[in-house]
């Protein structure tokens, strides 16, 4: 395995009074793909939420290392700025908010800078081309009427931007 991009060490996570994860260890290297599989209720989603910093999930032991930095105590917004992203099985549909507007707003929140529209649209177009995604999706309401595959492409686009 290459140097770990994400390393979970002896992670213990609880929700309210119930410990869900009991000493989980995991290492994911750069350019590796891992799949978590198991029956319902075995902690797959809990691990994802703990990695993203969802405050409902309390890390009571262990650590989460991302790009060599311990992010265990960072709030969710700081983890997101570092590139931590959780893809949902059924992403929310947001009528009235275009995919383009959503991504631009998220980028501005991440960077703290107001993005020039021309520069943003250029980067958006280039990134959509990488995904073989029709540019018209940028002006559609976020995930509204998207097929399952289009929703996944939308999430990947958000992550890449």
Q: Predicted regions span which residues?
A:
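Conserved structural motif at the start of ABC-family nucleotide-binding domains
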Residues: 6-8, 21-23, 28
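The feature captures the beta-strand-to-loop junction immediately N-terminal to the Walker
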Residues: 37-42
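ABC ATPase NBD Q-loop/coupling interface
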Residues: 63-79, 143
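ABC-family P-loop ATPase nucleotide-binding domains
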Residues: 92-161
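Helix-to-loop junction immediately C-terminal to a conserved catalytic motif
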Residues: 52
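Short coil-to-beta microelement around the adenine-binding A-loop and adjacent beta1/P-loop entry
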Residues: 15-21, 78
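Short hydrophobic beta-strand immediately N-terminal to the Walker A/P-loop
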Residues: 34-36, 48
């Amino acid at each position: 395995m290459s140097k770990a991009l994400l390393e979970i060490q002896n992670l213990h996570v609880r929700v309210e009074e119930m410990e869900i994860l009991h000493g989980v260890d995991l290492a994911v290297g750069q350019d590796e793909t891992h799949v978590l599989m198991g029956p319902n209720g075995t902690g797959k989603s809990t691990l994802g939420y703990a990695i993203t910093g969802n405050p409902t999930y309390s890390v009571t032991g262990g650590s989460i290392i991302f790009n060599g930095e311990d992010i265990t105590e960072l709030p969710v917004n700081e983890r997101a700025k570092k590139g931590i992203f959780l893809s949902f099985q059924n992403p929310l549909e947001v009528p009235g908010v275009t995919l383009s507007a959503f991504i631009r707003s998220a980028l501005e929140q991440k960077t703290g800078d107001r993005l020039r529209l021309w520069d943003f649209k250029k980067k958006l177009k280039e990134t959509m081309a990488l995904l073989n995604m029709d540019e018209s999706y940028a002006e559609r309401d976020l995930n509204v009427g998207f097929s399952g595959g289009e929703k996944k492409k939308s999430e990947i686009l958000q992550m890449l931007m």
